[in-house]
Amino acid sequence: MKYLLPIVPLLISFGGLAQCDQNAIWNNTSTNEICTEINGSVKYWYTNSLPDHVTGTFPGQGNPHSISAQQTELTMCAYPLEAGEFTDLLIGGFNALGQCPTFEFGLATNGIEWDPVAAEWFENPNTGAINYDWNENALSPLVNLGTDMIDAHVQPTGKYHYHGDPTNFITGLGITSSEHSPIIGYAADGFPLYYKYIYADAQNSNSAIVEATSCFILKSGNRPGDGTTAPDGGYDGTYVEDFEYDGSLGGCLLDQCNGRFGVTPEFPNGTYYYVITADYPVVPRCFAGTPDMSFSIGPPPAGCEVSNGESICFALSIEPSATEIADRLMIYPVPSNTGMLNVFIAGNQVIQPTQVSILDNSGKIVKTEAYHQRISINELKSGVYFLKFTFDKTEIIKRFVKK
């Protein structure tokens, strides 16, 4: 859990939150149904994976499969924390032995999964050998995966899933460009997902509503391949590897995972969150937190598609000490016109963070290091920043200004 000044502690009562009858959900094979519940630190989702909006015609459109009800159970952390490093959805490719090759990104609030990674790669035209370094972009008009009008299609099992922007679903939610998007889903790591209309200032809920745009661009020049063992020709978006992230783009609000830390209507004290954008990647291609293995793709005997929430998720502390730590933790001088910040934790009880991160005003992590009572900010430009202190099962954020 993260806190922004002023600190507002969130007290959670564990237990008593179970409410889902998964068998009743799975027995419904004709209409959309979904339920979620929290048990301890893990959030459980049960859905029959039937869409609640108009879809394309299946079988057809290059896809021979029919939509059918599923018995889907997924888990994620109810109180996610940032991992300190990003995890790609494409873990190692389908040639990776002994591990799950890819992750689905997450789940929409209607129970339909986002699975943006295409199981298609560059193929040697002479030998049929697969080059797993070049993954086809499912959203490219040059790639035909038999998707419908909202870039969704059906797996051989009958499961309907999204590859891109599910506009029919979005329209049904009544989302417009005049107000901040509601939560439209959750990533496999538990952080929320929003549509493209968000606050211009990540830390100010009174700022203008803007359309967040992708910070990815097509690479310049030509691919290095020979057209036989690897693709050649200009970078045109046929492959995921045709794109690169450029955080220096004007108006860039999002990080490499199409996300940022900031306030939202549902999280007035701030959270990390993801955003669906109009252009590539549209659906995020990496995680800022730790994804649950129930969203991985691969054989269950190898640990794929099996929940590991009990081992990766942490419950929020409901003890007064969480609030006390926030009140006792002080940084000075603020504002700072020196190259150092001092940290002081009042009281006799020895409580220390394990690490500290500096976030800029957009919520992007500038640096992370082991905790010290004196923190160098000499390299920072003038502006508003945040210090994120990571304790055992609590994160506390303090704002400061570098002059």
Kindly label every feature range from the protein language model:
Residues 18-64, 279-281, 286-321, 380, ...:
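Sequence termini and other peripheral, non-core segments
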Residues 19-146, 150:
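Solvent-exposed N-terminal domain segments of exported/luminal and surface proteins
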Residues 157-167, 272-276:
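Histidine-centered catalytic micro-motifs
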Residues 158, 270, 381-384:
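A glycine-anchored, Pro-Gly-centered beta-turn/N-cap motif
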Residues 189-191, 196, 200-299:
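Extended, compositionally biased non-globular segments
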